[in-house]
Amino acid sequence: MHIPAGFYPDWLLMLGNIIAIPAVLLAIWRTETRFWSGWSEGLQVAAIFMALSALYMLQADIKPGMAVHWLGVMLTVMMVGPWTAILVLSAIHVFLLLSQGIGDVSTLGFNIATSVLLPVVIASAIHLFFYHKFPRIVPIYFAKVGFGDLMCMWAVDAVLTLCLLTWSGYPSFHIYQDFTLILALMGGMEAVISTWVVAGLVCYFPIWLVTFNDEEYINGK
């Protein structure tokens, strides 16, 4: 979601910057260098960047300067891992701000904290939970991606709704009508689409999924 300038108090936006900047720097340090040095891996990152940039521009405007968009976090984490996902998704926010004027410089850190960092943490936790607690079979892998995308979208919905209710003075009825319902519906659609995409990747490009291993999920080893 893109928050307009002046919608939240300055201290909350500053808190977003305090959280986002160290997290992005840590992601730069921890990300796997093969995603930047290898031709195939670089192509994969570029494809994710272009696809999500296009999807983010297909946003639903709620009020002037305020819009919601697809997240694609769970699928991105499954493809490149959490640290690279943070870099790619944060870069998309910066790219859209500079090239399309989507968002605002003062709210960039808050947007990254809520629309990138929080969903990536949730996606990683869901992946680890399913990996260790459920059988490692392909249908479970598909279900994990769909469930994770839905939970990521709803988590962002819950946090931003709480902030809106607490600090913005935005009427609660309009929050439900214009914001919460839209994100809930988008979460469901994103879960279905992500499940289809990951099914195609498992069948044709499993090498693009760093969290998928043929020996574990197909051969049962």
Where do the PLM segments sit?
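Hydrophobic alpha-helical transmembrane segments
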Residues: G42-M50, I86-S90, G109, A113, ...
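Alpha-helical transmembrane spans of integral membrane proteins, capturing the lipid-embedded, hydrophobic core
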Residues: I18, V45, F49, S53, ...
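Alpha-helical membrane segments and adjacent membrane-interface helices in multi-pass membrane proteins
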Residues: L55, Q59-P119
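Short helix-perturbing small/polar motifs within transmembrane alpha-helices
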Residues: P22-A27, L97-L98, V105, N111-D157
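Loop-to-helix transition at the N-terminal end of transmembrane alpha-helices
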Residues: W36-S53, G72-L75
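Membrane-interface helix termini and inter-helical loops of multi-pass transporters
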Residues: M1-G6, K63-M66, W70, Q100-D104, ...
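Alpha-helical transmembrane segments and their cytosolic interface
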Residues: M1-W11, G16-G42, P171-K221
